[in-house]
Amino acid sequence: MKNLHSLFLASAFLAGFCGSSLAGEREGVVVSIKPLHSIVSAVMQGVGKPKLIVQGAGSEHVYSLKPSDAEAIEHAKVIFWAGPSMETFLDKPIDTLGEGAKVVALGDAKGLTKLKFREGGPFEAHDHGHGGSHEEEHDAHGSGDHDHAAEVAEEGHEHHHHGEYDLHFWLDPQNGKILAADIAKTLGESDPEHAAQYEKNAKAYGEKLDALTREVAAELKPVKDKPFIVFHDAYQYFENRFGMKAAGSITVSPEKAPGAARIQQIHDKIKSLGATCVFSEPQFEPKLVKTVVDGTKARTGVLDPLGAELKDGPDLYPQLIRNLANSLKDCLSK
């Protein structure tokens, strides 16, 4: 009897495997990076859990796809990522392994506040690999009031004007709210049975992010006008939302070490502006930051745009935003 039961379970497993993989059926949700995975997780609560590609302290700038990642992409029904200019390591795998899945570049979500890359002076020139013109002109230095941000609401996910826009859009919690609604819509179309649950979750998460936005704005108000330097220019969405003032970045690409002239330029900028803090990131060696602040009165801190040390899941994203605020306030208020 026991052997018969084991045989039945084995047969059922094989039948399920053949019915999905061999028949080409897709199931499950895959997300590229931790902040976006957190928002998707919140929308999917009570229904399922998405698969995360870049885990732990990994960075989308230098990540190499693992066999388990490739397998997840191959069988995914829905794939969420920021877009081809952010997670370049996913370009080819999505085109090949992801063929047949619904692939959603969240950088194209309707209604997002989108900001152009900052260039010139303390902000090093960017390489617009996927460049393309846009119908509207936007403020390239959107680190002030929200009115300076570009509200782009084009045609959903069909267009890919990533080259001129900064894709760290999730660092504005109000963008996070828009993403949650967009994700709920996408999941509801792929899984109509749970569409109402996705919508309910997204609404609740949006309300949570509204409260978080108010909380962070109040916390940062005393240090809004204090200049600081960041490791790479990833934070202008956060700055724009909360009226912060980055004076420059050490490098535009974390995987590309700046030259001696660039380091000297930032060093001089710190001295001339009296920049209070220079921030590193946990994904990369802090040696450059130490070199830049040497001989100045600037302190050092850590800003994490990905939630490297946070536990994956729906709570990661709000905690990431809160941690950015805490790190800025702690360093700038000393």
From Swiss-Prot:
One of its GO terms (molecular function) is metal ion binding. It comes from the Bacteria. Residues 1-23 form the signal peptide. Keywords: Disulfide bond, Ion transport, Metal-binding, Periplasm, Signal, Transport, Virulence, Zinc, Zinc transport. Residues 120-147 are annotated as: Disordered. GO terms for cellular component: periplasmic space. Zn(2+) binds at E60, H61, H168, H232. InterPro entries: Bact_metal-bind_prot9 (IPR050492), ZnuA (IPR035520), ZnuA-like (IPR006127). One of its GO terms (biological process) is zinc ion transport. The keyword Disulfide bond applies. It is found in: Periplasm. Disulfide bonds join C277-C331. Pfam families: ZnuA. Belongs to the bacterial solute-binding protein 9 family. Part of the ATP-binding cassette (ABC) transport system ZnuABC involved in zinc import. Binds zinc with high affinity and specificity and delivers it to the membrane permease for translocation into the cytoplasm. Required for survival and normal growth under low Zn (2+) concentrations. Also required for virulence and intracellular growth in host cells. This is High-affinity zinc uptake system protein ZnuA. It comes from Brucella suis biovar 1 (strain 1330). The lineage of its organism: Bacteria, Pseudomonadati, Pseudomonadota, Alphaproteobacteria, Hyphomicrobiales.
